[in-house]
């Protein structure tokens, strides 16, 4: 059985290459991965830094003799200031954020959701260890970013120890 968060996060990646503004790591099947995921593969993760933007690229190669199935659901983490009210989420295009976009079970994620929102200010009363959910009717954007005073950072989960770790999880199925 595969762990709910997958096997790659618990695996040791090899360094493939280092460039002026990129680094690539590679993971291939091994005895441990094959016990959870019965396919031969090559997963390359490349991080590219351009100006103030960090991009992550995933490349999966089927090295097996049969069709493989996979999903990338990354949980990148970055250290940030704990002054959460200084942050906002910006969508590429205006989105229809539902009233039931949640901060916690019954608490709205935004102060006053509007029909079309491009930027959402993060509430100052974030509870460490809680995940913030923003539900959209039909997502129009191909990207979402978190801004801090004009500098893009990325990703939204606030760690329970309130150390300023921030995680954003997007999974495409």
Q: Where is each model-derived feature located?
A:
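Beta-strand elements of well-folded, non-transmembrane domains
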Residues: 29-31, 49-51, 62-64, 76-80, ...
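Extended, loop-rich substrate-binding clefts of extracytoplasmic carbohydrate-active enzymes
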Residues: 2-51
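Active-site/ligand-binding surface loops and adjacent short beta/alpha elements
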Residues: 77-161
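Structural motif
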Residues: 22, 53-55, 67, 143, ...
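Hydrophobic residues positioned within well-ordered beta-strands of beta-sheet architectures
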Residues: 23-25, 43-45, 56, 72-74, ...
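A C-terminal functional module that forms or caps the active site or interfaces directly
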Residues: 157-173
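Acidic (Asp/Glu-rich), glycine- and aromatic
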Residues: 41, 57-88
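Residues that act as N-cap/strand-start positions at coil-to-secondary-structure junctions
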Residues: 7-10, 39-41, 72, 83, ...
């Amino acid at each position: 059985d595969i762990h709910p968060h997958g096997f790659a996060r618990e695996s040791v990646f090899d360094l493939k290459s280092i460039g002026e503004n990129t680094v690539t790591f590679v993971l291939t099947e091994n005895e441990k991965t094959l016990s959870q995921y019965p396919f031969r593969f090559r997963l390359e993760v490349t991080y590219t830094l351009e100006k103030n933007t960090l991009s992550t690229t995933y490349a999966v190669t089927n090295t097996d003799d049969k069709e493989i199935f996979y999903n990338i659901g990354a949980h990148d983490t970055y250290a940030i200031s704990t002054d959460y009210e200084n942050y906002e989420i910006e969508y590429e295009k205006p989105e229809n954020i539902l009233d039931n976009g949640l901060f916690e079970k019954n608490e709205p994620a935004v102060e006053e959701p509007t029909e079309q929102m491009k930027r959402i200010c993060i509430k100052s009363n974030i509870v460490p260890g809680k995940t913030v959910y923003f539900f959209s009717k039909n997502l129009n954007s191909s990207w979402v970013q978190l801004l801090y005073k004009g500098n893009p950072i990325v990703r939204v989960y606030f760690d329970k120890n309130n150390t300023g770790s921030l995680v954003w999880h997007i999974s495409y199925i």
